Each structure stands twice: as C-alpha cells, then as structure tokens.
From Swiss-Prot:
A Pfam family assignment: 14-3-3
Alphabetized CDD domains for the sequence: 14-3-3_1
UniProt subunit comment: Homodimer.
Family: Belongs to the 14-3-3 family.
Entry keywords, A to Z: Cytoplasm
Protein name: 14-3-3 protein zeta
Main location per the UniProt record: cytoplasm
Gene Ontology cellular component list: cytoplasm
Length: 247
C-alpha cells in the first residue's frame, strides 16, 4: 500500500526535527516522484533535506582531502586517506545525481511560475557545482559547464521576472558569485555579480516583502560579507565564502 503524500511530508518534518536528514530526503524524494508540483513548503523541505545530506559529505571531503595532503611523508596513511576520500566522493556524487535526476525529470518541467523555475534552476546549478568541487579533468569541465548554464538560465529569468529584493533572486546571485569565485577562479566577476545584486536590492529596499524581510536582509549581509572577504588582501587560507541556503 502506498503512503499518501501528506503522510510523507509529515514524515519529512519529523525527520527534520530529529535531524535525520537522510530519512527526510528519502521522504521528500518520494513526494517529488508522485509527479505533482510541490508547494512552497514541500519545495523548501526537499531543499533543506538534500542541502544537509550533501553538506555533510562536502564537509567530510574537505577534511579528508586536507589530511591526505598533510600525510605526504607516510605512504600508508596517505593511501588510507585517499581510499576514504574516494568513498566519500562516491556518496557525494550519488546524492548529487539523485537531486539532478529529480530536477530534470519532475521539478523543472512542472515549475509553473518564475519563482519555482528560478529556485529549481539555482538548485541545479548548486548540485553541479558540488560535483565540480570533487571532479577532475574532462568530467570537471562538463559539470562546470552544466552548473554555469543552469545558474545563467535562472539568473536571466530572475532579472526579468523578480524584484531585486526577492530572497530567491538574492540567493541565486550569492551562489552564482561563489561559483565564479571558487569554481571558475574569477574573483573580479564574482565581486561584480555580488556587488550588483547588493546594490540593486539596496536601491529598491521599499519593495521588501514583509514575509521575506528577514531572508532578504540575511542574504544581503552574506553578499556583503563575501565582498569584504574577496576584496581583502589579507584573505586567510581557511576562509570559506558564505553560500545561500534554501530560499
């Protein structure tokens, strides 16, 4: 007997409260596969679930990669670290392709308004970006292209159809600028994009929606933090730029 949609959503909310994000993602994947367009709440649950599931692997990957580089003197330790990194990479890739499959098969084709379309295209850009973080050679070239195309498509729709203060438009600008900085190594383009988004939002602060005021101002702060980080000459090695979450 199939579980109904409301029950799956409730299960996802329970899992979120228990911080069991793998369960949360599994429930929201099932909801998505019913083929019905997601509500805003469901869309956010899906995004939060996978953001946490993939985030844990991204964080692990960074730690293991760092250890691998520091154990150059000991071949055995380095080999262990390498094998463990490869295991985490495999998990990370599987999660990303899971999400990208849901986006291409269900979410993007069913998106009936610009807000949803931008949200899902941004998500597509994000998950190809996560693949790019661990990819090398020809594979990296391919996922970088896919990420840039998804972000660019989302960016054009957001500029044409959404207020500069809309949290989804701001979150997209934040993550697209991180893509330029971290993946394409283009700090000038990253700063230009982030600054433009920040300035455009400041110029139209009166259009800030009361419901999304907190989200919008938080992302504006993150844009400004990244600009400060990227333009300072004393940038430390360990500084990670801020990314937008689940707007």
């Amino acid at each position: 007997m199939s579980v109904d949609k409301e029950e799956l959503v409730q299960r996802a909310k329970l899992a979120e409260q228990a911080e069991r994000y793998d369960d949360m993602a599994a429930a929201m994947k099932e909801v998505t596969e019913t083929g019905v367009e997601l509500s805003n709440e469901e869309r956010n649950l899906l995004s939060v679930a996978y953001k946490n599931v993939v985030g844990a692997r991204r964080s692990s990957w960074r730690v293991i990669s760092s250890i691998e580089q520091k154990t150059e003197g000991s071949e055995r330790k380095q080999q262990m670290a390498k094998e463990y990194r490869v295991k985490v990479e495999k998990e990370l890739r599987e999660i990303c392709y899971d999400v990208l499959g849901l986006l291409d098969k269900h979410l993007i084709p069913k998106a009936s308004n610009p807000e949803s379309k931008v949200f899902y295209l941004k998500m597509k850009g994000d998950y190809y970006r996560y693949l790019a973080e661990v990819a090398t050679g020809e594979t990296r070239h391919s996922v970088v292209e896919d990420s840039q195309k998804a972000y660019q498509d989302a960016f054009e729709i957001s500029k044409a159809k959404m207020q500069p203060t809309h949290p989804i438009r701001l979150g997209l600008a934040l993550n697209f600028s991180v893509f330029y900085y971290e993946i394409l190594n283009s700090p000038d383009k990253a700063c230009q994009l982030a600054k433009q988004a920040f300035d455009d939002a400041i110029a139209e602060l009166d259009t800030l929606n009361e419901d999304s005021y907190k989200d919008s101002t938080l992302i504006m702060q993150l844009l400004r933090d990244n600009l400060t980080l990227w333009t300072s000459d004393t940038q430390g090695d360990g500084d990670e730029p801020a990314e937008g979450g689940d707007n």
